[in-house]
Swiss-Prot record:
Its EC number is 3.5.2.9. The lineage of its organism: Archaea, Methanobacteriati, Methanobacteriota, Thermococci, Thermococcales. It comes from Thermococcus sibiricus (strain DSM 12597 / MM 739). Belongs to the LamB/PxpA family. Forms a complex composed of PxpA, PxpB and PxpC. NCBIfam families: PRK05406.1-3, PRK05406.1-5. This is 5-oxoprolinase subunit A. It holds the Pfam family LamB_YcsF.
Length: 255
């Protein structure tokens, strides 16, 4: 069995530092790098791409809503054409640094409120996917496991990766429990590891109300924005390897 570990990185901005990128990069195989609209700036983008190169981690674009103040976690009502061009613009910005460092772009994973909005908005999804396809149809689109956007992406001829979340609780319908609700974020590293092993080996996990949710796990999102999160990521990788699950990049998984 094989699985990819991804993390959202490059989310500092100017003098504001967010995340422990160098620490979490030791344990992951794919980096989702902010493209300057919800977080990141040109210096941070290049620094993070170079860090990924030095640590042999694959690079993906992490585009979001143009909302630095809200960190891309606030919904915006976009037309399909706006979404298409917003995505293409951000991918292009990151790709300049990717190319400058002699790398290729592996995937695109939308950020925050945009990621969640795709699950319930087909027109928005099509716009985002058209933006990705405009750039390169061979790039992998990362979306919420077993969700409609992944079906649409496959119908459009794009490669897809089903993403699960290590430290988040699930609703019975397979969506993530809102961060505003109690129990939405799981902090115990042993519980996190057992849930992820269940997702990979058993094809699902118990939802917040105890119902079984079927999931496909191609890539696992882990966090590295505080020392405990890095500790959890290190422990999770160790436990997965102990279970005989090989940690590889999306590029090796998705052909």
């Amino acid at each position: 069995m094989k699985i990819d570990l991804n993390s959202d990185l490059g989310e500092s901005f100017g003098r504001y530092k967010l995340g422990l990128d160098e620490e979490v990069m030791k344990y992951i195989t794919s980096a989702n790098i902010a493209c300057g609209w919800h977080a990141g700036d040109p210096l941070i983008m290049r620094k993070t791409v170079k860090l990924a190169k030095d640590m042999n981690v694959e690079v993906g674009a992490h585009p979001g809503y143009p909302d630095l103040m809200g960190f891309g976690r606030r919904y915006m009502d976009l037309t399909k054409e706006e979404a298409r061009n917003y995505i293409l613009y951000q991918i292009g910005a990151l790709y300049a640094f990717v190319k400058a460092e002699g790398l290729t772009l592996q995937h695109v994973k939308p950020h925050g409120a945009l990621y969640n909005a795709l699950v319930r908005d087909e027109e928005l999804t099509i716009g985002v996917l058209e933006g990705i396809a405009d750039f390169d149809k061979n790039i992998i689109f990362v979306g919420l496991s077993m969700s409609k956007p992944l079906e649409i992406a496959e119908e459009m001829g794009l490669k897809v990766a089903h993403e699960v979340f290590a430290d988040r609780a699930y609703n019975p319908d397979g969506t993530l429990v809102s961060r505003r609700k109690p129990g939405a974020v799981i902090h115990n590293k042993e519980e996190i590891a057992e849930r992820v092993i269940s997702m990979v080996k058993d094809g699902g996990v118990k939802s917040i109300n105890g119902e079984w949710v079927e999931l496909r796990a191609d890539t696992i999102c882990v966090h590295g924005d505080n020392p405990k999160a890095v500790e959890i990521t290190a422990y999770l990788r160790k436990r997965l390897e102990e279970e005989g699950i090989k940690i590889v990049s999306m590029r090796e998984l998705i052909r």
